[in-house]
Every structure is written in C-alpha cells, then in structure tokens.
UniProtKB/Swiss-Prot annotation:
Coiled coil: none annotated. One of its GO terms (cellular component) is virion component. Belongs to the asfivirus p49 structural protein family. It is found in: Virion. It comes from African swine fever virus (isolate Tick/South Africa/Pretoriuskop Pr4/1996) (ASFV). Residues 144-167 have a biased composition (Polar residues). This is Minor capsid protein p49. Keywords: Late protein, Virion. Together with the penton and the other minor capsid proteins (M1249L, p17), forms a complicated network immediately below the outer capsid shell, stabilizing the whole capsid. Plays an essential role in the formation of infectious virus particles. Especially required for the formation of the capsid vertices. During virion assembly, associates with the membrane and probably mediates the docking of the penton complex to the inner membrane, where it recruits the capsomers to form the penton core. Its main location: virion. It comes from the Viruses.
Length: 438
C-alpha cells in the first residue's frame, strides 16, 4: 500500500509539475524536490520544502537525506528515463549508436558528443599558442590574456561566437577517433588492440578511452609541453599502451596527477618486463585504474579548476552540492549534472561494476586520497555506496561474455576465479586481480 501511495504521488507530480520548480534541471524536478516536498516534514504540500543539499533557495528543513530520497525514487520507478542505470534505452537521448551496435561493435562507431560537452571544450579550452589556433595571433595582447578568463568566454547559448576554429580541434590537438582506427591500423600505428583483443573478449576497450569528451577536456586543460602534446596527438593518449614511450606516459601521468589532485598509479615497470602477456595485462588494468582515478577526481571531487565550469550556473550548483562521501560511480548513477556521464560510465564495464578504486575520504589528512587494494576485495566494505547490478550493462543482448549474476559486493574471488581472471578470459574480473600499488 505504501508503495502504491508513493507511486501515485510521483505519477501525479510528473503529470503536472509545479511552476516553482519549472526552471530546475530534470533530475532535480523528478527525484530531489518532489520527494523533499512530500516527505521532509511538509505534510499538507502547501509550500515547497528544500533539503539543505539541493542548493536551492529556501529554508532547509531536517528530514530524509537527499541520497535516501534519490534511492527511494529509483525503487519506485526504476524505468524512469532520467535515471542512468546503464540500460541501452537510457542512452538513446545521448548517443546516435544503434542499440544492437552499442557494445559488441562499439569500436566501429564514434560516440556522440553531447552539446554541453562541445560547448565546454569550445568555451574553456581556448589555447593561445600560434601553432594551435593561428587566428589568435592577430589579437591584441590584452585580448589574448582575456581569452582564458571566464568573463570573456563566449556565451554557452552562442557557440558561433567562439574564438576557436570552425573545426573541433586543430592538428596539434586532434585526438584519436574511431573513424581513424582503420587508417591508423593500416599504418601500423595502433598495435595495442592486437595484444589485448584476444585476451579480453567482450570488453569494449582497445587501449583507448571509448568516450573522448572527458579525455579531451582533461588533456587540453593540462597545457602539456609541446613534445608531449605532439606525441599524444598522434597516439590518442593511450595511458596503458606499452608502445608509448615511457617518458611521455610518465609526463602525462604527472600532469594529470597535478591537475586533478588525485595520485595516479606508479611508474612503468622495468624495460625488461615491458613485453609479453603479463605486462599487457598489467598495462591494461593499470590503464583502467588510472581512468577511474581521473574520472573520480573530475566528476565527484572538489579539485576541479574553476575555469573549467565557470559561468555554468547549473553545473556549478550541482557540483557544489556534491558531498565527497560517496564514490564517483554512485553519484554518476544518481545525478545528471553532466549529460555525457550517462554514456560514459556503462562502457567502462569493469569500473562500472567493481567501482574501483574507491577513495577513503576519512584519511585524507595529508591531502592525498587513500585507495583500497582491490586485489583483496576490500571494496565489499562499502556495499552501501555501490550501485547494484541491474542487468543493463551485461545484458545478454549486448554482451554475452559478461556474467549475469555479477554483484559488486560479492564474496572474494576463489583461487580458481583469480586464475581465470589473470588469464584475461573474463573482462569483468580483470581489474580486481591487479593491485593499484603496482
């Protein structure tokens, strides 16, 4: 009866949204404020009651926590389109990839860029070097200096007024795209896929991040040295690729660590161990862990540089309201503060299901996050924060190699299972077999 009553409230709400929240983001309208007004002490529904974590005007009133309300709304209507739980149908508004091609044949398609991410790149990653944006060289010095300031950046509503070239990136900042894959492979530039493809069937990962948006923003914001940038432009920035020169990879890791404030995994192994299947598996798993660290820092931590999200009130408000107590993935599944996160997360299958690594925020006295050793399966200590497997990511229609009964809070792997994962036969077990301390 309680379930039916609550469902009716949500159904009534969605049919006629109140005017006082018509200008709020969709995820706030449908999951935050409705439940705040219904269950946070406002018995008669006469006026909206705001939870202190919604970052909305009004007097905060003690009641259920925002995370409880979100989880409650998920239980009521898990098929709601505004909830990104990884189902292919939830990705439709954000991706032009056909459903049947989404995972098994993902490498043949280039992911769709969200309009918001396009504007982020155009507005905030303006480079003033002549070699990158030639038309900038004709500007006055004062204008050059102002290009990277939020006040002088073009409006999000008028991307045509942007100071960047008509093409997305110049040659110096052109990154790997899936259209380039056959051409690059023919030239012999990309060999990483040949090492990993046979060992990780079903894992949508060719040594490169499947979704470019986050990587482009990160790497352009790093202001990497010209030599590193040139090498990266031709390589697609594969962090774990053994064919990338060690000094370039370490430079990128160092820059990423400095920018995000999150410790990235240690240096490359000795030269004599940089070959063979053992190193390839190590490199791939290490790469995925690094990606997890970067994404966690950018989307769930408070180490984002101001100019990246300046003058975007909605994003600023939502990011400011995030409390760093839950791991990155939990927030990514529960909020829509960046559109492309819905298309990004499900494609990192190992990260999406193992949620690895998880920072221990209670021990950040020295300013560095402490990561648990996933090889010991200590992640199970955080069951309350790990989204349960819902069937969308490893659906048999999308990927027959992914275990259907997988749960992130499962018991530790047996010796046989660990051996199985070390052989690379099951993509879902790869990350947990590698320690972040390597």
């Amino acid at each position: 009866m309680y379930h039916d009553y609550a469902s009716k409230l949500l159904a009534d709400y969605r049919s006629d949204p109140p005017l006082w929240e018509s200008d709020l983001p969709r995820h706030n309208r449908y999951s935050d404020n409705i439940l705040n007004s219904r269950y946070c002490g406002n018995k008669n529904g006469a006026a909206p009651v705001y939870n202190e974590y919604t970052n909305s005007p009004g007097q905060a009133e003690k009641g259920l926590q925002l995370s409880d309300l979100r989880n409650f709304s998920f239980m009521l209507n898990p098929q709601h389109k505004n909830i990104g739980y990884g189902d292919a149908q939830d990705l439709e508004p954000y991706s032009s990839i056909p459903k049947n091609k989404l995972f098994n044949h993902f490498k043949n398609y280039r992911p769709a860029f969200s309009t918001h991410t396009e504007n982020l790149i155009k507005r905030n990653v303006v480079r003033t070097e002549k070699k990158t944006f030639p038309q900038v060289s004709g500007l006055k010095d004062t204008q050059k200096n102002c290009l990277t300031q939020p006040s002088s950046l073009p409006s999000l509503k008028n991307p045509k007024n942007s100071s960047v070239p008509s093409t997305r990136f110049s040659e110096h900042t052109k990154f790997f795209s899936y259209e380039d894959l056959p051409k690059l492979r023919t030239k012999g530039t990309i060999k990483h896929e040949q090492h990993l493809g046979d060992q990780m069937p079903g894992q949508c990962y060719n040594g490169y991040i499947p979704h470019q948006d986050v990587y482009n923003i990160l790497c352009l914001a790093h202001k990497l040295p010209a030599s590193v940038e040139k090498e990266i432009a031709g390589r697609g920035i594969p962090l774990g690729n053994p064919h990338v020169k060690p000094n370039i990879e370490q430079e990128l890791i160092k820059s990423t660590s400095t920018y995000t404030g999150v410790p990235i995994l240690g240096p490359l192994p000795p030269k004599d161990s940089q070959h063979g299947r053992e190193h390839q598996e190590f490199s791939a798993n290490r790469h995925m862990l690094q990606v997890s660290n970067i994404l966690h820092s950018v989307f769930a931590n408070h180490s984002i540089k101001p100019q990246i999200l300046e003058d975007i009130p909605v994003l600023n408000a939502q990011l400011a309201s995030i409390k760093p107590v839950s791991p990155f993935l939990n927030k990514a599944y529960q909020t829509h503060y960046m559109e492309n996160i819905v298309t990004l997360v499900p494609r990192f299958k190992s990260i999406a299901n193992y949620s690895s690594p998880i920072p221990n925020y209670s021990k950040r006295n020295n300013g560095q996050a402490e990561y648990f050793d996933t090889s010991k399966q200590t992640i199970s200590r955080h069951n309350n924060y790990i989204p349960k497997y819902t069937g969308g990511i490893g659906d048999s229609k999308l990927d027959s190699t992914f275990p259907k009964d997988f749960n992130a809070s499962s018991v530790p792997l047996t010796s046989a299972e660990k051996d199985h994962s070390l052989r690379g036969d099951n993509s879902a077990c790869c990350i947990s077999s590698i320690s972040p301390s390597l």
